[in-house]
Amino acid sequence: MTNQQGRLRTRVAVFACVAAAALIVDQLTKAWAMAALSNGQTIRVIPGLLSFTLVRNPGASLGMGSGATWVISLLAVVACVALAVAGVRTISMKWSVALSFAFAGALGNLIDRVMYADGFLNGKVVDFLNYGWSVGNVADIYLVVAGVVLVILILMGEPFSHKDLIEQSDESLQSEPEADAK
């Protein structure tokens, strides 16, 4: 096995393990919420900031798109495939970990849409983390955090692929003679 193949296997293993662990946490917290909050009760955790309230959300973030649940579900399928492919193709462990959390979040909510469906891809996501202005779940937290981390990686110039790495090397080589001339 070459060094490059070994690094690829490591990234794939990390992606799979992080995504699986995150997905398990998401699904266990939703199972707890459905069992503990099924009678419509609210549990106050931090008064004014966080409570647990069970909500079945047919839409996307903040309940948007509740009339187009199947479209949201199809987009989630596409997102899961794209995130898995990107997570395996990247050369960066940082990108791989961030993408694994995004994948776990997208897949966690997609699982809800399939398991709690009124028809083909017409299900509802289990939300229970009530912030007062929004109700979400652990998968939503993964998606938000992954999004922030991905933006940071882009802004930091973290190479995603070999092409990015080569372009960065070429740019640094081109800027060195300019620096030497000054």
UniProtKB/Swiss-Prot annotation:
Cystine crosslinks: none
Q: Does the keyword Hydrolase apply?
A: yes
**Reaction(s) catalysed (UniProt annotation):** Release of signal peptides from bacterial membrane prolipoproteins. Hydrolyzes -Xaa-Yaa-Zaa-|-(S,diacylglyceryl)Cys-, in which Xaa is hydrophobic (preferably Leu), and Yaa (Ala or Ser) and Zaa (Gly or Ala) have small, neutral side chains
Q: Name one GO cellular component term.
A: plasma membrane
Protein localization: Cell membrane
The protein's topology relative to the membrane is: Multi-pass membrane protein
**Which EC number applies?**
3.4.23.36
- Quick one: a GO biological-process term for this protein? proteolysis
Residue ranges spanning the membrane: these are 12-32, 68-88, 91-111, 135-155
Q: What is its main location?
A: membrane
Pathway(s): Protein modification; lipoprotein biosynthesis (signal peptide cleavage)
Q: Enumerate the UniProt keywords alphabetically.
A: Aspartyl protease, Cell membrane, Hydrolase, Membrane, Protease, Transmembrane, Transmembrane helix
Molecular function in Gene Ontology: aspartic-type endopeptidase activity
Judged by the first EC level, this protein's enzyme class is hydrolase
Active-site feature positions? 127, 140
Pfam families in the cross-refs: Peptidase_A8 (PF01252)
Question: Which InterPro entries does the entry link to?
Answer: Peptidase_A8
Family of the protein in this entry = Belongs to the peptidase A8 family.
What is the documented function of this protein?
This protein specifically catalyzes the removal of signal peptides from prolipoproteins.
- From the Swiss-Prot or TrEMBL record, give the protein name: Lipoprotein signal peptidase
Q: Whose protein is this, by species? A: Bifidobacterium longum subsp. infantis (strain ATCC 15697 / DSM 20088 / JCM 1222 / NCTC 11817 / S12)
From the broadest rank down, the organism's phylogenetic lineage runs: Bacteria, Bacillati, Actinomycetota, Actinomycetes, Bifidobacteriales
